[in-house]
Regions:
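Active-site-adjacent scaffolding segments
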Residues: 46-49, 110-113, 132
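Residues immediately C-terminal
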Residues: 58, 90, 105, 121, ...
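Conserved catalytic/switch belt of AAA+ P-loop NTPases
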Residues: 72-73, 97-114
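Conserved adenine-binding aromatic site and its adjacent loop/helix in ATP-hydrolyzing domains
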Residues: 69, 101, 124, 128
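Clamp-loader machinery-focused feature within the broader ASCE/P-loop NTPase space
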Residues: 1-94
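Charged, glycine-rich active-site and insertion segments that engage polyanionic ligands
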Residues: 1-22, 28-40, 109, 117-248
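Structural recognition of the conserved hydrophobic beta-strand(s) that form the central parallel beta-sheet
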Residues: 83-86, 111-116
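A generic secondary-structure signal
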Residues: 70-74, 102, 146-150
Length: 248
């Protein structure tokens, strides 16, 4: 059992997925090109790698019980049954107690990868039963270098995006590649600086809500389209092919 710790932007969830991909792939992630297994793990479609995440304040006890049941199953196609729990610090003590035995004595075929902002955010009973990996937030220069090497943005744009994102790679990439996001951010800063009356704050809040709704809808559509494209690529389906019932 492993506990991967790092503040927002450090890539702890991506680290967990990459680790899982290396464990499951026949080449252990050493090939120049990613294997099919690696692609499936990173895309979230591998049958033996399960990710527990939540957008709620806490992770429910029923969710943990369900994933424990999954952990007890033998892997179907790979060497390991891997369970990734994002934001394990969101578990209440009662929920954590349900998980303790599995973490302390996992099944021979199962590996647990837990993620949290820091080891101090996790109950001592979890910390003492895991191997801890601490990640650091990348520097502004490192993030800017990543953006220029993986996107088509100019160095000046990459540098500004990295500085504003304060080391958070995901946010920096969004700033660098989506002009509307950067424009909305600049508009917000100017709006706050120009607030003079309570009515100004109300108008600004209304604009922020409208922009957030539009951005959320656009992001959801983009993510859905990307996931479908990746799913089709992994399963050898052309964009115009119908998805067979067995793959749905």
């Amino acid at each position: 059992s492993w506990l991967i710790c790092g503040p927002p932007g450090s890539g702890r969830s991506n680290m967990a997925r990459a680790f899982a991909a290396a464990l499951e792939s026949p080449d252990h992630g050493m090939s120049a090109e990613p294997t099919r297994v690696t692609q499936q793990v990173l895309a979230g479609t591998h049958p033996d790698v399960t990710v527990l995440t939540t957008n709620k304040v806490t992770i429910g006890i029923d969710q943990v019980r369900e994933i424990i049941t999954t952990s007890e199953q033998m892997p179907a196609t790979a060497p390991w049954r891997i369970i990734i729990i994002e934001d394990v610090d969101r578990m209440l003590e009662r929920t954590t107690n349900v998980l303790l035995k599995e973490i302390e004595e996992p099944a021979e075929h199962c590996i647990w990868l837990l993620c949290a902002p820091s080891a101090q955010d996790v109950l001592p009973t979890i910390r003492s039963r895991t191997r801890i990996v601490n990640l650091a937030v990348p520097s502004t220069q490192a993030v800017a270098g990543f953006l220029t090497s993986t996107t088509n943005v100019e160095p000046k744009v990459a540098q500004r995006a990295a500085r504003l994102a304060e080391g958070h790679i995901g946010i920096a990439k969004l700033y660098a590649t989506d002009e509307r996001v950067m424009s909305d951010r600049d508009e917000l800063v100017v709006g706050v600086l120009n607030l003079a009356r309570a009515s100004d704050a109300v108008l600004l809040a209304g604009n922020l809500i409208d922009n957030a709704k539009a951005q959320a809808e656009a992001d959801a559509n983009r993510i859905t389209a990307g996931q479908e494209a990746e799913f089709r690529r992994i399963n050898g389906l052309a964009p115009s092919d119908r998805i067979p019932p067995k793959l749905r």
